């Protein structure tokens, strides 16, 4: 990571500065605690950049800890993908990877301590009854009939829960706090529930599993976390976080701070809804280039640096706000405009025959970047038969159309001026071939007689071009806030993926997966990291040359 990316300013960093200056903490210790029940998305990337970035900038530590307390929804596949995403984004965690399940024995002991203090009880209400008894924002809850059990009875029942003597959903351990609290999270929250499921780390050792709110704070304390950073939806949960730590024997009491979550327009961040997109086969998988997942963005052609830059630009605040998709797209567009080598690709080809070109193949020198000579150049074959894009030719056009028109001239990029003389069509009236002449004295220079040729179009040699599948990706949803729709699936953009079969210049034969290029006049593309091969080239559009959605929203 470059120095330019370092040291942003936000309210959390101000808190860290104050804590270090006052001596409250001698060093900084943060953590990133994802649940391994799905792939990380751009919202997680914001949290990663915040937690790991603070640890890096203050020469502290940041743990990677998996909040693995629900074996039913978790999988080792997600564990491995999350580790890969964190490393790909450019960060390293401190020490070994940690798991909340590492602390299951200690968590059980702390639960027993709460029971012994009369602060937890085994409840045999059904989950539906617990919800009913909890009350609402306007009505207080009411006590469970099992709330008054003795310490001895609760200890015995909790042991039975651990031994598998209760069926799932028939008993749970709850904190004894205040059923009339104005904060619903404090109305005797569940601490442990029963799940007969094999755990990816602990196997079948446990059939009771701690809840997030009980696990999270204790794990932070056991690891000596100094600043526990969460998104705003956990603001009320801070009361429970502090209550648990205040009522058990543990030397460390971290402080939780909340920041705004990332709400990205034209995207969905809910894991449940993202999973639905996958299971309903609306997308190819979690790494579909239209998904807001880190793996999807990577496959689409986003770089780690562009995602870090985006997270720095949007900042860290206490107020939820919506971020425009164009802000994310601008970060990768700016980077690729600066760094991506140029290449020519024809997405919707029509054949051009240059009738007065009698020589064989000529190699034309092209710069890899128009403003960076240090990136070198390449030799591109030019021959009698070429392909141009169908949109670059019209039989008739007005003066604003600066491409190839029947009877008029246009320049081929870094090559010659050609003139459309006649066309050939098939039985359906579709143009199959454009017959042209060329001016042999115009290789990368103006005509000698001073005539003006305004348009420039790209091309590839028909003999040497490589067939390629070109996937033109766009925003997955057609409205800025798909989550607000009654059925978010009805807002899917039908044009979010358009597959074209075109041709690319031969220099792209060995394009490496995720390698970015600017296809001149088309946009930024990369070789697909799943399907592209030397035998079958597949390129994904990362982003267009300019923001076309800005016109739609105007």
Curated annotation (Swiss-Prot):
Localization: Cytoplasm
Motif ('KMSKS' region): 268-272
EC identifiers of the protein: 6.1.1.18
Origin superkingdom: Bacteria
UniProt short sequence motif 'HIGH' region, positions renumbered to this chain: 34-44
Main location: cytoplasm
GO annotation (BP), single: glutamyl-tRNA aminoacylation
Keyword Cell division: no
Gene Ontology terms, MF aspect: ATP binding; glutamine-tRNA ligase activity
Keyword Ion transport on entry: no
Positions annotated to bind L-glutamine: 67, 212
InterPro entries the UniProt entry points to: aa-tRNA-synth_I_CS, Gln-tRNA-synth, Gln/Glu-tRNA_Ligase, Gln_tRNA_ligase_bac, Glu/Gln-tRNA-synth, Glu/Gln-tRNA-synth_Ib_cat-dom, Glu/Gln-tRNA-synth_Ib_codon-bd, Glu_tRNA_lig_a-bdl
GO cellular component: cytosol
Subunit composition and interactions: Monomer.
Name of the protein described by the UniProt record: Glutamine--tRNA ligase
Species name: Serratia proteamaculans (strain 568)
